[in-house]
Amino acid sequence: MMQVLLVTICLAVFPYQGSSIILESGNVNDYEIVYPQKVTALPIEAILQPEQKYEDAMQYEFEVNGEPVVLHLEKNKNLFTKDYSETHYSPDGREITTKPLIEDHCYYHGRIQNDAHSTASISACNGLKGHFKLQGETYLIEPLKIPDSEAHAVYKYENIEKEDEALKMCGVKHTNWESDEPIKEASQLFATSEQHRFRERYIEFFIVVDQRMYNKHNNDSAAIRTWIFEMLNTVNEIYLPWNIHVPLVGLEFWTQGDLINVVSSADKTLDSFGEWRRRDLLNRKAHDNAHLITAMHFDAQTLGLAYTGSMCHPKYSTGVFQDSSEINIFVAITLAHELGHNLGISHDVPSCTCQTKACIMSPYLSDQPTKLFSNCSEIQYERFLTQRNPKCMINKPLRTDIISPPVCGNGLLEREEECDCGSPENCRDPCCDAASCKLHSWVECESGECCDQCRFKRAGTLCRPARDDCDMAESCSGHSADCPIDGFHANGQPCSHNLGYCYNGKCPLTLYQCRAFLGKDVVGVQESCFQYNRLGNTYAYCRKENGRKIPCAPKDEKCGRLYCSYKSFGDYISCLPCYRANEEDKGMVDEGTKCGEGKVCSNGYCVDLNVAY
């Protein structure tokens, strides 16, 4: 029997309900005062390390709404890279870079016991501060500033008074950059989201704090640092389902003035920041992605802006976002959203769903915090991985954790261990020998679509059915835990009852494109509307040549601007163009769309299938 030391800090638990209080998140209308009890059961070897202040795993007990809850916490070991650095500037403009020791940090992810859908992102630096999801509702917790007291406030997000109810939105900037490795051709295969989600990836992340942000927080770099660490801990929690880690490689404070022109136009600020990163920052510090956080209020209620599908690019792997709220989780969601654009994910349309009212990639900030990506986001991320092959995300940064001897049986996978499922009495992993923390000799696999009870599934077992006419079903090979990469039918094969032709695994139809652009109120597409594309005016054209809008020839008119029949509030519009002044290249008919029998759109022309493919 493993020797275990039980450490318990017993504190009185008196839940107290108050009517109103001013907390870090703002004025809170309804809250509870609780006194968490820390109960930690760890092997003696794991806790007797004098250099380690914060345990790898902890438990706290307290009450919410009069019911006891147990909060399980585990340290986020991928929050920092080994070479993490901070930069600020002296009054005479000199760059000063330090490498602070952050080997024993206090930022955790967690869950509530007996709630399978619970999540938590918590700082345990000075009491418990952060948020957790319990029975589908988001709660915030923070210590009260009472001397010699362990009192904490627990409150629902909905009980925070909101000062600004204006609709906030995200911008998105599309790129046409060519990656260092060419984008895979359309005939190549897509890999599955399952394969990619469960392969670990790392975005070595750099944050720049502009002078407005620095001044807004009273030039207190320590307070800003803590705020950013808490925010990034939540961003990491959001991306965990896709097995993406976002370790912080560096933090820079523009203490003496901005190094670019930060203006109210998010578009201009992003362009300047991307150019500065390419020209300056990358020459000083290796990283995969950088974002600027600013206290500037961007035009048009924009909270942030990022390039789409640009991860790993020297200029375009960037974003800018606003310090827009006292509520840390909301700024974290904004950053996670902008980072999603860098990963090739566009805004959700009405048909996209997740388990909450709004999803991460909604174009507008929801009045309820959400940490879930939609089904659409998952598909787009999957395609980005295959088409762009972002190699910078594959390398694993060195961890900053104190290297201590592995302790078999503590439930944490450490160096020299193949598995760790806890004590033999508690182990529920059939693949793991709990006594040695090694896999059983007969184990072929641990997880995967083609793995069952630690062995490969039989060859021919269906692991992914065909999604539609353009997709193909895949079966297990019998010698791998992974479902084979997702193949699709050749471009040009008829699909959707001959209404279209397959293109890159999809069946592009103008009706679906209209609904993606305008929403569920689209009622159809009237072919006669496409004759407007012969005009060659502001929005009606087939393509651009040297910035000039080229009118469509009659044979090409179905390959220019998209027109939709739309009905809303009783009004019917038959030829509504899909056009946005600030993104005029969006709303064109998609490549591969059928424009006649045996013909598809290609670069603004209607061409024969054998020419297109």
Curated annotation (Swiss-Prot):
Residue positions binding Ca(2+) 1? E204, D288, C392, N395
| Sequence positions bearing Pyrrolidone carboxylic acid | Q195
UniProt xrefs under InterPro entries: ADAM_Cys-rich, Disintegrin_CS, Disintegrin_dom, Disintegrin_dom_sf, MetalloPept_cat_dom_sf, Peptidase_M12B, Peptidase_M12B_N, Reprolysin_adamalysin
Residue ranges constituting the Disintegrin domain according to the UniProt record: 405-491
Q: Give the superkingdom in one word.
A: Eukaryota
Q: Which residues are glycosylated?
A: N219, N375
Gene Ontology annotations of biological process type = proteolysis
Q: What is the enzyme's main class?
A: hydrolase
GO function term, MF aspect, one? metalloendopeptidase activity
Q: Which residues bind Zn(2+)?
A: H337, H341, H347
Q: Could you say which protein family the record assigns here?
A: Belongs to the venom metalloproteinase (M12B) family. P-III subfamily. P-IIIa sub-subfamily.
According to its UniProt entry, the function of this protein is described as: Snake venom zinc metalloprotease that possesses high hemorrhagic activity. It inhibits collagen-induced platelet aggregation and activates prothrombin (F2).
Protein name per Swiss-Prot or TrEMBL = Zinc metalloproteinase-disintegrin-like EoVMP2
Organism equals Echis ocellatus (Ocellated saw-scaled viper)
Q: Which gene does this sequence derive from?
A: Svmp3-Eoc22
